[in-house]
Structures are given as structure tokens and as C-alpha cells.
Amino acid sequence: MKGMREKTLKSLEFDKIVKLIANECDSELGREKVFDIEIKKDLKAIEFELDLLNEAVKFIYSYGDISFSFQDIREHVKKAQIDYILYNRELLGIKNFLSLVEEVKAHFKSLYDREDFLLLKEFDKRLVPLKSLKEKIENTVISEDEISDEASPVLKAIRRQKASINEKIKSTLNSIISTRQKELQEPIITMRQGRYVVPVKQEYRNVFKGIIHDQSSTGATLFIEPIQVVDLNNELRELELKEQKEIERILFELSQEVKKNAEAIFKDVEVVSELDFLFAKARYSIKIKASRPELNTSGYVNLKKARHPLIDPEKVVPIDIHIGREFTTLVITGPNTGGKTVTLKTVGLLTLMAMAGINIPAEEKSQISIFEDVFVDIGDEQSIEQSLSTFSSHMTNIVSILKKVNKNSLVLLDELGAGTDPLEGSALAMSILDFLHRTGCRTIATTHYSELKQYALKTKGVENASVEFDVETLRPTYRLIIGIPGRSNAFEISRRLGLSEEIIENAKSYMSGEAIRFEDVIKDVEEKRKDLENAYQEVERLKKEVEVLKEELEKEKRKLESQKDKILKEAKEKAREIIKEAKQTAEEVIKRIKEAEEKEKNKDRAIQEIREKIKKNLEELEEEVLKPKEFSYGKIPDSLKAGQTVYIVPLDQNGIVLSPPDASGNVEVQAGILKMTVHISNLRVKEEQEQEEVKKGYSRFINEKAKSISPSLDVRGMTLDDALLEVEKYIDDAYLAGLNQVTIIHGRGTGVLRTGIAKFLRNSKYVKSFRLGRYGEGGDGVTIVELHSR
């Protein structure tokens, strides 16, 4: 910690804040940076730190937190710079750090198109990923004890040879064990001094040929390398030496790669350490629900709902305090343990936090001034719960403060003038406040001397404040009230505790009349303040209720507007879909007609002749039914029924009514091969005497239709779309033909056709009911459809 005297930092417990932030760090280097935090005096520098901090806070809220955990690898890199060989553990540490750099870069990718993370983007630019070096280490070093076979072709070949010789040795030893069990203590293979041996009984030492490498503690067992594997063991040992030499060569090469990238690694370490420090501040800010302070250099402090960050959040009482505009000196009076010292420490600590680029636990838009120095007299190494100050230690400290203070200082004095005779102490306190007031610095002092209350009332630029005390509960509320001096409350407290009224009245007689009147005035002002505050709170409550109601009404209005827009939009979309579907259906029909015609051309002559004959008959029928001789048309019809012939005005064509008009006046009409819906206003009916002739023509048409309609339709093997087209046409024809019941054969299969057809039938206005076939009708492979009567 630097930038402020140590006594101030400790008295205000800033060192504890630093430790809490350090606990949020992931790396040792990040913690080092926290403990090296600086209390800055330059406004731009502090604003920059706060900008950076609040980008980190926003990043955590937007994208989640990042871990910056890594070990300090700087010493490893320095060793590589002087051509030392780095071994597995050191290289793995470097590899892990380089992986972290890549992870951080990946986290910051989401910021590339964001304009509100400019400072974090600069960190991203400073980070240099060393992917090639990371992959080389990754492909070489498997663990702290193992190098990969793939590290080099030479190493791979050596290890292959080793494996082969190991197999030979074990095979030979297994053969010895199986044939000479009597001479062995146990049928096992073990190792001594890097060579394969077997445990031989002492009495067979001269019989069992080989080299003795060890013996048991009792001497009963000798560990002998059989003569048959001595050469193989020698060869294995040579390969192990070659392997070690190759590994050292590989590690040296990797160390040289680290050396080449040393500067980039050092820079990355610095950037990641800074980020760890920054995100630790951000985590702490989120944890204490802090906000960014507004800074100034005019000496103005205005804290709203400020909380001391070291007090339990469940117990801390937020305070509102301001100084530096209407007054530059604030005298806080009130009972001991009432929260006066906490108020001093809160102002001082939050000022230091802001100057260190740390968010403060207060409401947004709280204001903090940047001071050249912060002077504190709150006892020697005092904590909030404990006071060890004496008059002499107070005065020594105050003398030092008075020598150094200037107009750009913040001075915090606890229990000014305490520890000596009250008359002399209060006189000294007023004189010290006079001196500080003349320098123009910002001073907050606490006291329980009533003389200082009167001094504050009489002196321009000096203001009283008090810590509220609840006489009912005999407890301080810890709320700070600016503008009203505190009362001792001694008489009220004594009365509540049971002291007789006689003694209390007698005590008052020892006080001067002026002192009693002063206390009564304070009491009266305090009561009126409480009444006003209660009234204000009621007004605020009502205002909030009105705001809530207003917001609810606005929300309801927006909801209705949104629903209106949504309904209109959905209607337009539905219309577009209907038009699109109609076009697609028309195109599909045209396509099918063309395909059918194309197929017709390829049929033999006999079918062609039949087709021509049918066509001729249909044309004659159409001429007779749908295109009769010129008739005179009357007015728009009042009502229509199925079977009537009508003139369709927009098409200049006759058509047959398929169903009566619906509630909206829309009529379903058949014109040639096309079926359409037309509004009744676009239809005309024939004269009465000619209508009968048309009806006869229509009847002949229906009779012809009935003859050609089969009582069943087979759609097996078709796709659902094709089947639905066939079913729709079939149902229309069957209804026109006057059939009461038809059968649709769809087969069992997967059930897709059955389900799709059932859905269509459910929505068809011609269908009265439908069901699956019963036994003897085709079962669930068919659907029996009952049609409405025409």
C-alpha cells in the first residue's frame, strides 16, 4: 500500500479492505499487486481505474467470471534465459500458463463487437498467445515424471528396443523361476540397483550362477542376477543412459524455445496478474454491493446510504452525510457507542477506497472529493469495537496534524478534547476547530461536550450533527441527523431506568437555566424533526404507490397496444399465408394437369379415343349445365341453396352453388374444374321461368356424377399431401353426387395417412361423422365417412 501514511491506513482499517480484495485473487502475483495498491491523488488516474473496474464488473454480470489461477513461472523463464535445462514440472507450469492466456483470449472474444468494453479490449490486445510453444510442450511432456514417446524418433526407437529387451529378460527369468523353484525363496522377479534379480536361498548361493546385488536383513535370501540375463541387463542399462541423454537433449531444445519467447511470456504474466487484481476488485465490489462514486476536487463529500464495509451487512445502519458546501466543519455529538466513530471511519474509509479506484458501498451518485491528505485521530491502532486513546496520545497526534494540514486535507477527529478536564478540554477543542476552519480543510469531529454544540451553532461554516438515540428502547439507532446537535438524554434515560422524579428535578436545579433551556430547545427541535420526517416518509410512501399504479397503468396500456399490433400483424401474416397456399395449390393443380396430359399422350390409341369421347361428352354437359344460352340476370340474390346456377360477375362465367351463404355472405361455388368462395354480392340469379330449365340440367349433371363416383377411394401408397388432395376432391364429388356414406382405404402402415385424413375430415363441412372400419369392413385400415344430405 502506498500513497498515504501508514497510520491513516491502519486507523481507518484500509489494510483490512486490501486483505479482503487479496482473498478474491486467484494467483500469488495478483495478490502481490493488491498489497501494492496505491492511493492516487490525480483525478484522471482515479477515473481511469474506476472505468476499468466497472468494465470488469459489467463483464462478470454479462459473461460470467474468469479464473486467473496460475503459478509464478518467472523464475523458470529466467533459468531458460541463461541456458539452464527446464525439467518436466517447470515446463508444465509454463504450458499451463500459456493455456490460461488462450482461455482468457477466448473469454474476451465476445467483446470484439462491443463498444462499451474498450479498456478490457486493450488488455486483450496486450496478451500474446504462444500456441506453438504450448503445443510443443504439450506434445512432449506428459507428466512430471514422463516424456512422450513421440517427443523424437530417436527416443521412440530407444524405448522400442528397451521394451524388446525387457521382454527377453522377463521371459528368461520366468523360465528360470519355473525350472529352479527349489532354489528360490519366492517365485518372483524384482529389481536391485536398476537390474533384474531373483530371491535365492542362502544355501544355494554356490549352485545358482550369477551376480549377487543384495541380501535380506536376516541373510537368508540373496538377490542374484542370473548369469543368463547379465548381458541383457547390461544392454538395457546402456539403452537407459541413451534414453536419458535423448530426453535431456529434447528438454534443452524446449528450454531454448522458452528462451526465445521469454519477453512475450513476461509481458503475458504481467497482463494476467493485472487482470487477476482487477477482477478481484470487481468480485469484491459485487460482494459488498458497491457502486461507482462521482469524484470531484472541490472538497465536497456527499454519501447516500453509506455502509461501513467491515460491519456485518445484516447489522450495519446506512448513513447519509455531506460536507464541503454550506459548511466545511461538522461537529457530531451524541452518546458513547452511538455510532459517532463508525461515521468518522465510514467517511474516511470510503474516501480512501475511492482514491484507490475501488467502488464504495453507498448508493449511486454518492460523491467523494479527492484530497491531498487524510488525517485521522481515532486512537492508537483503534478498531471500531475498542478505544485505547488517552489525552496525551490524542494531543501528540493532533499537534502533528496541525503542522501538516492544508485546505485540500480531510481531517477526522474522534472525541476531540476528551481525557482531561471538561472545561479545558472543550476550550482546546473549540480552539483546534477554529484553526482547522481557518485553513479551509474539511473537518469532521465527534464530541460529547455541550459547549461544542453551541460553538457549532454560533460559528459560520460549522454545522452540528447528532447520532439518533431511541429513548423508548434506550438504544442508539446509529442514524446520523445533520443540522441538529445531540442531547445527552441523561435525565430521560435515568427516568426510564426508574430513578425518582424528585432526584431528577433536584439534579436539574444544579444546572444553569440557560443549559436547561438549551436542552429543552434541542428536545423540541428533535421532536418536530421526527414529526416532519414521519410526514415526509408518508408522502414518499404515497408517491411510490402512485408511481407503482402509474407504472401498472402504463404497462397495461403497452400490453393492449402490443396485443393490437400483434393481432394486426398475425392477421396480415395469415392473409399472406392463405394467398401463398392458394397460389401453391393452383400451381400444384396446373402441374398435375400437365403431368396427366403428358402421360395421356403416351397411352395407346384406344385410350386416346375414349378420352376424346369423354371430353366431348363433358363439353356437351358443361355447355348444357354451366354455360346455357344467354339469360337475363336479375338482382343480387336474397338467398341461395346448393344446386342453384348463378352468374359469377367478376369471372363473367356461370357456376353451381355448392353450399348456402355463411354468416358473412360468402358462398362456395363450382365453376368448371375450379372451386372457389365468392361473396353473394358478386352473384346474380336467373329469371324464375328459366331457372327450372337450369335445375333440370343440374340434375342431369348430378346424376351423371353419381354414376361415375365410386363408393370408396383407395389412397394406399400415396404421400400424405397427395392423399389429402385426392380425399378432398373425392368428398366434394361424393357430396355433389348425393352419396350418404363412402369408404376411404388408407391401409394400416405407420398410421400417418389415417391420422392426417382424420384431421382433414374433422374440419370438412360436408362430413357429418366418420369412424374406423369394423370387423368385415376393413378394420382400422379404412375410414367410414357419413356425409351431410344436400
Swiss-Prot record:
<comment type="similarity">
    <text>Belongs to the DNA mismatch repair MutS family. MutS2 subfamily.</text>
</comment>
<dbReference type="InterPro" id="IPR027417">
    <property type="entry name" value="P-loop_NTPase"/>
</dbReference>
<protein>
    <recommendedName>
        <fullName>Endonuclease MutS2</fullName>
        <ecNumber>3.1.-.-</ecNumber>
        <ecNumber>3.6.4.-</ecNumber>
    </recommendedName>
</protein>
<keyword id="KW-0255">Endonuclease</keyword>
<feature type="binding site">
    <location>
        <begin position="334"/>
        <end position="341"/>
    </location>
    <ligand>
        <name>ATP</name>
    </ligand>
</feature>
<dbReference type="GO" id="GO:0140664">
    <property type="term" value="F:ATP-dependent DNA damage sensor activity"/>
</dbReference>
<dbReference type="InterPro" id="IPR036063">
    <property type="entry name" value="Smr_dom_sf"/>
</dbReference>
<dbReference type="GO" id="GO:0005524">
    <property type="term" value="F:ATP binding"/>
</dbReference>
<dbReference type="InterPro" id="IPR007696">
    <property type="entry name" value="DNA_mismatch_repair_MutS_core"/>
</dbReference>
<dbReference type="InterPro" id="IPR005747">
    <property type="entry name" value="MutS2"/>
</dbReference>
<dbReference type="InterPro" id="IPR002625">
    <property type="entry name" value="Smr_dom"/>
</dbReference>
<keyword id="KW-0067">ATP-binding</keyword>
<dbReference type="GO" id="GO:0019843">
    <property type="term" value="F:rRNA binding"/>
</dbReference>
<keyword id="KW-0238">DNA-binding</keyword>
<dbReference type="GO" id="GO:0072344">
    <property type="term" value="P:rescue of stalled ribosome"/>
</dbReference>
<dbReference type="GO" id="GO:0004519">
    <property type="term" value="F:endonuclease activity"/>
</dbReference>
<dbReference type="GO" id="GO:0030983">
    <property type="term" value="F:mismatched DNA binding"/>
</dbReference>
<dbReference type="Pfam" id="PF20297">
    <property type="entry name" value="MSSS"/>
</dbReference>
<dbReference type="InterPro" id="IPR036187">
    <property type="entry name" value="DNA_mismatch_repair_MutS_sf"/>
</dbReference>
<dbReference type="GO" id="GO:0043023">
    <property type="term" value="F:ribosomal large subunit binding"/>
</dbReference>
<keyword id="KW-0540">Nuclease</keyword>
<dbReference type="InterPro" id="IPR000432">
    <property type="entry name" value="DNA_mismatch_repair_MutS_C"/>
</dbReference>
<comment type="function">
    <text>Endonuclease that is involved in the suppression of homologous recombination and thus may have a key role in the control of bacterial genetic diversity.</text>
</comment>
<dbReference type="InterPro" id="IPR046893">
    <property type="entry name" value="MSSS"/>
</dbReference>
<keyword id="KW-0378">Hydrolase</keyword>
<dbReference type="GO" id="GO:0016887">
    <property type="term" value="F:ATP hydrolysis activity"/>
</dbReference>
<dbReference type="InterPro" id="IPR045076">
    <property type="entry name" value="MutS"/>
</dbReference>
<comment type="function">
    <text>Acts as a ribosome collision sensor, splitting the ribosome into its 2 subunits. Detects stalled/collided 70S ribosomes which it binds and splits by an ATP-hydrolysis driven conformational change. Acts upstream of the ribosome quality control system (RQC), a ribosome-associated complex that mediates the extraction of incompletely synthesized nascent chains from stalled ribosomes and their subsequent degradation. Probably generates substrates for RQC.</text>
</comment>
<keyword id="KW-0699">rRNA-binding</keyword>
<keyword id="KW-0694">RNA-binding</keyword>
<dbReference type="GO" id="GO:0006298">
    <property type="term" value="P:mismatch repair"/>
</dbReference>
<dbReference type="GO" id="GO:0045910">
    <property type="term" value="P:negative regulation of DNA recombination"/>
</dbReference>
<feature type="domain" description="Smr">
    <location>
        <begin position="713"/>
        <end position="788"/>
    </location>
</feature>
<comment type="subunit">
    <text>Homodimer. Binds to stalled ribosomes, contacting rRNA.</text>
</comment>
<dbReference type="Pfam" id="PF00488">
    <property type="entry name" value="MutS_V"/>
</dbReference>
<dbReference type="Pfam" id="PF01713">
    <property type="entry name" value="Smr"/>
</dbReference>
<keyword id="KW-0547">Nucleotide-binding</keyword>
